[in-house]
From Swiss-Prot:
Self-association state and partner proteins as the record states: Fourteen ClpP subunits assemble into 2 heptameric rings which stack back to back to give a disk-like structure with a central cavity, resembling the structure of eukaryotic proteasomes.
Record carries keyword Protease: yes
GO CC term, one of those recorded: endopeptidase Clp complex
Gene name as annotated: clpP1
Organism: Leifsonia xyli subsp. xyli (strain CTCB07)
Protein name per Swiss-Prot or TrEMBL: ATP-dependent Clp protease proteolytic subunit 1
């Protein structure tokens, strides 16, 4: 008789290989889950790389910053791999990987743009919301500047409107360090190599 018990998801299986998958919009729910997985993997082994695969259209700035801050908080190197698209907050997370360990596949695309926000309420509420989004725009540009070597002014100018980058353009800009067609060409086999190899 076949086992009818609950089967672990493919994402649980990937986690055993220290792979975290962000394959959707960045939201509070998946940001909390990704941050928890980063902390779990760091607690299990603070020296082994953690792999974050990204195929995301972006999403919530505050949720994305929770992931970003956790990536910086753990002692592990974070290997990022962009597959499909890394747009908006997805771009920031891809770029936030450990320098030298940021990868993109040949057909992936990266989107840089300024943060979006919808405003409503009283004039005071709208002013407060506008100040918050301007602060976040400044902070996101500073992070991208530090990670790419571009000036904050250049990042702001380049992201003033939606700007899509091919894999090669993303490499040239400094969002990533390598273009790879195979996990075998990624540090640690992209998380697919047996432990200790």
């Amino acid at each position: 008789m076949a086992d009818m018990g609950i089967q672990p998801s493919v994402f649980d299986r990937l986690l055993k290989d220290r792979i975290i998958w962000l394959g959707s919009e960045v939201r509070d729910e998946n940001a909390n889950e990704i941050a928890a997985k980063l902390l779990l993997l760091a607690a299990e082994d603070s020296k082994r790389d953690i792999y974050l695969y990204i195929n995301s259209p972006g999403g919530s700035i505050t949720a994305g910053m929770a992931i970003y801050d956790t990536m910086q908080f753990v002692p592990n190197d974070i290997v990022t791999v962009g597959i499909g698209m890394a747009a908006s907050m997805g771009q920031l997370l891809l770029t936030a990987g450990t320098k030298g360990k940021r990868y993109i596949t040949p057909n992936a695309r990266v989107l840089l743009h300024q943060p979006h926000g919808g405003f409503g309420g009283t004039a005071s509420d709208i002013r407060t919301q506008a100040q918050l989004i301007l602060h976040m725009k400044k902070r996101l540009a500073e992070i991208t500047s530090e990670a790419t070597g571009k000036t904050v002014d250049q990042v702001n100018a380049d992201g003033d409107r939606d700007r899509w980058f091919t894999a090669q353009e993303a490499l040239d800009y400094g969002f990533v360090d390598h273009i790879r067609e195979s996990a075998l060409l990624v540090a640690g086999g992209g998380g697919t190599a047996p432990a200790g190899k």
